């Protein structure tokens, strides 16, 4: 198992900026001292994900996920700790020597996670073989010539890892088998198919191969394109598998993430070749859906990274319809600013770039974008005879409904003037009609509500039920946390951040346990951490804790604000508060028992419990809580 020197881990942790790293995955906005955005770990419409540049941690107040820069990448990208340190170093352009093992160690991972890792590894190896066959062998020569004739450079082929699957049934089958890979698992992964006789064979044959990556940058599927015959579908995609879902996958999304973030916009295209040609032309923020219409999952993925989308679909009728559907989804569901780049009829971006050149494409890309309203107004003309009075009135009414959705009065005035000029109407007449549309739009917005998908509640069980609503609300709590929860938080936070405080609190606690199991478990981890001779460092402690839920608890504690100076007196008060609460809870349980014995007319136990309650009351009233 690969290990990294502690000083290298410290160097990477101290020099990396968590806001910069997470900003490649989440659209972050400054909010006070922290940054907020939509959580990448659960679906939400309202930001509850917070990143602290001061503490270099993240925490989601919706699902409870949290940690530091390493645990973010481990959770989001499915990396090992060593892999996460290396990726942070690479993303931060740090010159450190970190070597990864040639084969990924999955022995300590759960079976499901281990199989997922193996399926991804199979795809990575297969992609390398396909690319080698295309670039270096006689079998790939015809496909290589075809791609070059389409204007694709070898640099782009290497960048996108484009390959070729030869016309044999066992190229990948034997390749994986020789490496000791499980062929049944390869079938589950979508690389192989099972024949009627039970034999496993290659799924892709005689096709140019486009590797598909997930949003973590891992190859998890392929799309194979025919190029020299028509005896099958033009494109053959990997089937739905445990690691690949078309509804959640955008081609080139991971690779385009940095450009999307830098330019603060994403470009949506229909085909792989469109994206590759756009990349070569200098448009590096382009992605494409996997032969499907844009889905809600795609839209949510986009929304996490940017608020602006440029739709650049094919210029034919089908492309215009697809642009309308995609834009409607992005505008109405995700509130994105959408623009449409309409190409000449019959041209897709790849065709246009090859025919007119990269410079011309970049020119229209920058200068000829239509606003979503302009596109909709043009789209509404479809299949209407504007010489017919009924169609004309209906068209104008539909246009006014769209104009009413605009927030800026100047924009509304601009489109009203265009309508007035085209149909020889006065702006005053249109404004009167617009007022009614504005009222209707306002009512629609008031009545419109978004239902957020349910979150994974596995972490929520770790949070005290009576405090979960306050603890995981992104807004400032309207009431204070309970005294015992505040006590547990402050004691744990103080112990994590200062070894002397840990020793003092440990002595003061004695045999007293934390009331909530999650705090007691974290306390046990902390005892072991300090017993190994470690210094007080919440980040190092977080890295040492294997449980993701505990990492989230640590990050939530780091978000807690503590008084400037805390010492023995304050710690004793916290512990008294904790002991008092535990006694009060014990009293409540006894009172419930007393009521039960009373109903059963069990006098002996009733008297016994009454005496125990009296003793607890004496302790509570006297302040002698031990």
From Swiss-Prot:
Q: E.C. number, please?
A: 2.7.7.101
List positions binding Mg(2+) 1.
270, 314
Give the Toprim domain ranges: 264-346
Q: What is known of its domains?
A: Contains an N-terminal zinc-binding domain, a central core domain that contains the primase activity, and a C-terminal DnaB-binding domain.
Q: Which GO terms describe its molecular function?
A: ATP binding; DNA binding; DNA helicase activity; DNA-directed RNA polymerase activity; zinc ion binding
- What are the GO cellular component annotations? cytoplasm; DNA-directed RNA polymerase complex; primosome complex
Which family, according to UniProt? Belongs to the DnaG primase family.
Q: What does the note accompanying the cofactor annotation read?
A: Binds 1 zinc ion per monomer. Binds two Mg(2+) per subunit.
Source lineage? Bacteria, Bacillati, Bacillota, Bacilli, Bacillales
| Summary of the function given for this chain in its UniProt record | RNA polymerase that catalyzes the synthesis of short RNA molecules used as primers for DNA polymerase during DNA replication.
**Where, by residue number, does Mg(2+) 2 bind?**
314, 316
> Could you tell me the Gene Ontology terms of the biological process aspect for this record?
DNA replication, synthesis of primer
Zinc finger spans (CHC2-type)? 39-63
Cofactor(s) the record lists: Zn(2+); Mg(2+)
Q: What is annotated about its quaternary structure and interactions?
A: Monomer. Interacts with DnaB.
Q: Which UniProt keywords apply?
A: DNA replication, DNA-binding, DNA-directed RNA polymerase, Magnesium, Metal-binding, Nucleotidyltransferase, Primosome, Transcription, Transferase, Zinc, Zinc-finger
List the catalytic activities from the record.
ssDNA + n NTP = ssDNA/pppN(pN)n-1 hybrid + (n-1) diphosphate
Q: Where is the signal peptide?
A: none
Protein name per UniProt = DNA primase
**InterPro entries found in the cross-reference section:** DNA_heli_DnaB-like_N_sf, DNA_helicase_N/primase_C, DNA_primase_core_N_sf, DNA_primase_DnaB-bd, DNA_primase_DnaG, DNA_primase_Znf_CHC2, DnaG_bac, DNAG_N
């Amino acid at each position: 198992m690969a290990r990294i020197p502690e000083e290298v881990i410290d160097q990477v942790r101290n020099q990396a900026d968590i806001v910069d790293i997470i900003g490649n995955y989440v659209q972050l906005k400054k909010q006070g001292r922290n940054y907020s955005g939509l959580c990448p770990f659960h679906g939400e419409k309202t930001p509850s994900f917070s990143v602290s540049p001061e503490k270099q941690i993240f925490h989601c107040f919706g699902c409870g996920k949290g940690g530091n820069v390493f645990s973010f990448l481990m959770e989001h990208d499915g990396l090992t700790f060593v892999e996460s340190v290396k990726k942070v170093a690479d993303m931060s352009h740090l010159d450190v020597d970190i070597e990864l093992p040639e084969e990924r160690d999955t022995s300590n991972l759960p079976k499901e996670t281990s199989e997922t890792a193996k399926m991804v590894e199979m795809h990575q190896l297969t992609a390398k073989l396909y690319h080698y066959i295309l670039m270096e062998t006689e079998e790939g020569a015809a496909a290589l010539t075809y791609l070059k004739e389409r204007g694709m450079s070898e640099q782009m082929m290497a960048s996108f890892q484009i390959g070729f699957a030869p016309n044999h049934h066992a190229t990948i089958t034997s390749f994986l088998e020789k490496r000791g890979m499980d062929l049944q698992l390869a079938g589950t992964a979508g690389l192989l198919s099972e024949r009627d006789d039970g034999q496993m064979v290659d799924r892709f044959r005689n096709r140019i191969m486009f590797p598909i990556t997930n949003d973590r940058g891992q190859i998890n599927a392929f799309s194979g394109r025919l190029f020299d015959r028509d005896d099958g579908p033009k494109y053959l995609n990997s089937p739905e598998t445990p690691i690949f879902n078309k509804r959640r996958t955008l081609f080139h999304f991971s690779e385009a993430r940095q450009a999307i973030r830098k330019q603060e916009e994403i470009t949506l295209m229909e085909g792989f070749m469109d994206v590759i040609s756009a990349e070569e032309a200098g448009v590096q923020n382009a992605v494409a859906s996997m032969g499907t219409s844009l889905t809600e999952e795609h839209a949510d993925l986009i929304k996490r990274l940017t608020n602006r989308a440029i739709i650049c679909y094919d210029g034919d009728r089908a492309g215009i319809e697809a642009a309308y559907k995609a834009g409607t989804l992005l505008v109405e569901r995700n509130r994105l600013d959408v623009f449409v780049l309409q190409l000449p009829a019959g041209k897709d971006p790849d065709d246009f770039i090859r025919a007119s050149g990269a410079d011309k494409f970049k020119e229209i890309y920058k200068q000829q974008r239509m606003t979503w309203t302009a596109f909709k107004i043009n789209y509404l003309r479809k299949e209407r005879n504007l010489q017919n009075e009924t169609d004309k009135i209906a068209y104008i009414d539909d246009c006014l409904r769209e104009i009413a959705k605009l927030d800026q009065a100047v924009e509304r005035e601009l489109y009203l003037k265009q309508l007035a000029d085209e149909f020889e109407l006065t702006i005053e007449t249109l404004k009167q009609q617009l007022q009614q549309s504005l009222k209707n739009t306002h009512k629609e917005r008031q009545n419109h509500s978004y239902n957020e998908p349910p979150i994974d509640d596995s972490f929520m069980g770790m949070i005290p039920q009576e405090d979960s609503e306050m603890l995981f609300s992104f807004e400032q709590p309207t009431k204070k946390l309970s005294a015992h929860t505040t006590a547990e938080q402050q004691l744990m936070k103080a112990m994590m951040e200062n070894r002397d405080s840990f020793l003092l609190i440990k002595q003061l606690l004695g045999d007293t346990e934390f009331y909530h199991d999650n705090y007691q478990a974290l306390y046990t981890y902390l005892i072991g951490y300090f017993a190994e001779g470690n210094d007080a460092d919440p980040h190092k402690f977080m890295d040492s804790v294997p449980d993701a839920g505990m990492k989230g608890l640590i990050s939530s504690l780091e978000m807690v604000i503590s008084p400037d100076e805390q010492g023995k007196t304050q710690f004793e008060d916290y512990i008294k508060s904790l002991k008092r609460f535990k006694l009060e809870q014990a009293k409540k349980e006894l009172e419930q028992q007393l009521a039960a014995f009373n109903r059963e007319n069990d006098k002996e136990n009733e008297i016994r419990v009454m005496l125990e309650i009296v003793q607890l009351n004496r302790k509570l009233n006297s302040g002698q809580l031990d």
